[in-house]
Amino acid sequence: MKKTTLLVILDGWGYSDSDYFNAIKNANTPTWDSIWQEFPKTLINASSLEVGLPRSQMGNSEVGHVNIGCGRVVYQELTKIDKAIEEKTFGDNKAICAAIDNAIKNDSNLHLIGLLSPGGVHSHEEHIFEMIKIAKQKGIKRLYLHAFLDGRDTPPRSAEKSIKKADKLLQDLNLGYIASVCGRYYAMDRDNRWDRVEKAYNAIVNANADFIYDSALEALEQSYARDQSDEFVIPTCIKKDGHLVKVQDNDSVIFMNFRADRAREISHAFTDESFDHFPRKKHLNINFTTLTEYDSKLKCAVAFPPEQPINTLGEVLMKNHKTQLRIAETEKYPHVTFFFNGGREEQFEGEDRILIPSPKVATYDLQPEMSAPEVTDKLVAAINSGKYDCIVCNYANSDMVGHTGNYEAAMQAIEYLDKCIARLKDAILEHDGNMFITADHGNADMMVNPETQKPHTAHTTNLVPFIYVGHKKAQVALEHGKLSDIAPTLLNVMGIAQPKEMTGKTIFNFEK
């Protein structure tokens, strides 16, 4: 029987001494409290420069899992795109130039779609504004912005400022206008809720929506009047001078999100010839360009293609003939597979994967336990089987329930996770294995913004825990660690040499 090394990633579980609406600190967590007292622990960085993001930028699930799995600081798309804009090479990008040239050659429209937000998690509005300026410089006559609204990585009702900026820029350049708005709940689903994606797609492509208004600001105001915050704005079309905008053959569409997981579904609706998740009027003959690669199967141009890192944790385990398991529920499954493997879709030899479906509820505060019971059942069975040298799992609760802004539900989620951790601890210790518990970023550690006294639905920049649970004696060797130090630590406890590509350092020293 193999002695399993288990990495538990508690998504959105940040550390804060403050008890002000801190769902993690204020929840009843007897198992967590005892582990925190009994076993070696430290706090590590999961945001900003330490994970390859701009200074003070909060971390996120994609970035976190890439850094953990690669064992090095991986500079993120946000940083790369910011650099291209700063160095004035953004407008020279071949894919972007081809999309603009297509619209000019065909005297057709250029559509920009994406999350209009300063959040910096899935997109950044400054990238959209820069693209608008470049389009004007290169001779585009008609540009239409289809704005997805955030309210999740930003305050729930904060889109007005972004819409006003976009409106002013388009007006100043006499270039076009915001042609549709919708909450990211619809356009950026990642859990096969195609009914939501269909509403967003129809508003963008067919100008078919439940609501039509004269301006994006009016659409936002009316949405607030219906008590729908930014994230949940029902797809709405904007009518200017009696004209509704549709996406037509020979148009160019540039998707301005840089993060893949929530951009895939609607991209497939635009590009797949045999798409069958909902009816489309026709398969459009358009130039579809994405800022980064969302899915290798998508038929589209990519402005900033991925760089595939070598010797990630998964690859090193394979080369050392170790068996590994990745497990998560739907919401975080891409993170423990695709992102953890540095953007690689294919499984490594000896790598098994278990996907547990996320519950079909409108928002996860309605079911704070999500699919944690099923994830835990599978994990305990895998540990007991003695089949795996290394298991990587993700619990989505503290992030996904944290994003709802529901403090009571977030505490319930944390308390349920505490029960799950108790089961994992018992199984690991019984089989003389090793368990590491960490997080990819913070979230549920601040459920209300202390400055505004309003719900805080975004991630935090707080440090995250890193705990060792096992029978080995361990000492903290690195006081100021970061996510990229986790993989080297796992290799250390497993007795596997760290490859030179992994620049992280081991956080704990283990007695031989």
UniProtKB/Swiss-Prot annotation:
User: What Gene3D superfamilies does this protein's entry cite?
Assistant: Alkaline Phosphatase, subunit A (3.40.720.10), BPG-independent phosphoglycerate mutase, domain B (3.40.1450.10)
Q: What protein family is recorded? A: Belongs to the BPG-independent phosphoglycerate mutase family.
Metabolic or biological pathway, per its Swiss-Prot or TrEMBL entry: Carbohydrate degradation; glycolysis; pyruvate from D-glyceraldehyde 3-phosphate: step 3/5
Which Gene Ontology cellular component terms are annotated?
cytosol
Q: Which sites bind Mn(2+) 2?
A: D11, S61, D440, H441
Subunit structure comment from the entry: Monomer.
**What InterPro entries does the record tag this protein with?**
Alkaline_phosphatase_core_sf (IPR017850), BPG-indep_PGM_N (IPR011258), Metalloenzyme (IPR006124), PGAM_B_sf (IPR036646), Pgm_bpd_ind (IPR005995)
The cofactor note from the UniProt entry for this protein is:
Binds 2 manganese ions per subunit.
Q: Specify the protein name.
A: 2,3-bisphosphoglycerate-independent phosphoglycerate mutase
Which UniProt keywords are given for this protein, alphabetically ordered? Glycolysis, Isomerase, Manganese, Metal-binding
Q: Where is the active site?
A: S61
- Binding annotation for Mn(2+) 1: D399, H403, H459
Instruction: Tell me where on the tree of life, at the top rank, the source sits.
Output: Bacteria
* MF terms in GO: manganese ion binding; phosphoglycerate mutase activity
Please tell me whether the keyword Cytoplasm is annotated for this protein: no
